[in-house]
Structure formats: C-alpha cells, structure tokens
Amino acid sequence: AGQLFTEDIYEPYIDNFKDRPTVVKALCLHIAHDCNLACKYCFAEEGEYHGRRALMSYEVGKKALDFLVANSGSRKNLEVDFFGGEPTMNFEVVKQLVEYGRSIEEANNKKFRFTLTTNGILLNDEILDFANKEMSNIVLSIDGRKEINDLMRPTRNNHGSSYDIIMPKFKKVAESRNQMNYYV
C-alpha cells in the first residue's frame, strides 16, 4: 500500500522560522482605486473593486513608506511599486511619495527602487520625465495586437482606440530608456 504523502524533510526547520523577525523588503502601493480603462477581465471592476473609486492620500502613502523602513531590518534596498487601478490618475501623490522616500533614504541607510505600473493612457512628457529620473522600472500593460487590445481594454465611455493612444507612448518610453528598464 503506497502513501499519498512523503515525509516532510523541512519540518525540523519550522521552529527556526517562527522565531525569526519578519522583514519587509517591498510594497505594492494601491495608489489609485480608480482606472481610466474598462477592461473586460478586470478583477478590480474598472477600478471600483465592488466599491467606490478613491485615490490614496499622501498621508496614507507616507505611513506605508514609514512602515516599510521600520520593518525592513538591515535590508538596504527597498522596493515600492505604484499600482492601481491606474496610478497616473494620482500622479501628484506619486511624486510627493517619491520625494518623501528620497528624503528619508540617507538617515535610514536605505535606497528606494520605485516602479510605475501603468496602462499608459495618461502618459505625457511630465510623467515620463519624472519616471525616467525616479523610477527604476516602468511596467506597461497591453493585450496584444490592436484588435484584441481594443476589444479587451476599451477606453471608458468609448473614447477611441486604447491601442492607438498607448502605442506611440510605449515607443517613446522604450526610446527614452534606451530600450532598458521597462516591461510590457
């Protein structure tokens, strides 16, 4: 008669892990509880998450960065991903939080690596210049060729092709970053 499970060779180590302090190295900040697309498959229900639309305040974001620093132990490099919904809908707070993060790095012996995850609809020169200066990475979302992307990712209120809006911007991101440090 065979056994369904084998012996757990890691069981003797469990107590060692229970005694270790928790160390946080990264946060994904849900900076915008809102979105400017109406993706057919969106888990967020177009930014609402079955609730109201909202934007994170600077004060809440600041507390999140303080929490990350306070709970990062001896880790020097910390990561923060600005996510949503669509984070560029709350771009002023993104800028303020990056500025705050930079202001506390030296005193806390930390280095923040910021990432912006965006659908690209609101990308403009101001956002791109800031991202190229302050964001280690930019994550750009698209759903393939034009026909599929526009079917699955329509703009809110059907304001044209999302593909036609984002593709020139995505190309500009790639060129401005020398084809590096961005993900599609």
Regions found by a protein language model. Give the residues of each.
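N-terminal [4Fe-4S]-dependent radical SAM core
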Residues: 1-28, 73
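N-terminal charged/capping segments associated with class I S-adenosyl-L-methionine
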Residues: 3, 9, 47, 59, ...
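A short, flexible beta-alpha/helix-coil linker loop
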Residues: 11-12, 45-50, 147
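Short, charge-rich binding segments
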Residues: 18-21, 32, 129-130
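Canonical Radical SAM [4Fe-4S] cluster-binding loop centered on the CxxxCxxC motif
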Residues: 28-59
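Short acidic donor-binding/metal-coordinating loop in glycosyltransferase active sites
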Residues: 31, 84-85
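Short, histidine-centered active-site or binding-site loop motifs used for metal coordination
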Residues: 45-48, 82-84, 153
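Radical SAM/AdoMet-radical enzyme domain recognition
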Residues: 65-81, 90-184
